[in-house]
Amino acid sequence: MPKIIEAIYENGVFKPLQKVDLKEGERIKLRIEEGILDVIKKYQGKFKLTEKDIEKFLEERR
C-alpha cells in the first residue's frame, strides 16, 4: 500500500522526517514532488501576485 512521508535530502541521502516501518536494506521507490512553497518561489516574479493572494491560495488548500 503506498504511503506518503516527508523526507529531507542531506549529504546524498534521503532522511525520513517520521518513523517508517521498513527492514534494513529494503528497496523502495521514491516519487519526488515539490512543495507548494517551492513552486511559488520558483515562479516568483513571473506572475503579479501579492503576498495576500498567496496566503489566500494556501488557506483555500488547507
From Swiss-Prot:
Classification via Gene3D superfamilies: AF2212/PG0164-like
The entry's keywords: Toxin-antitoxin system
Database matches in SUPFAM superfamilies: AF2212/PG0164-like (SSF141694)
Keyword Lipoprotein: no
Pfam families: AF2212-like
Function per UniProt: Possibly the antitoxin component of a type II toxin-antitoxin (TA) system.
Protein family membership: Belongs to the UPF0165 family.
Protein name (record): Putative antitoxin AF_1095
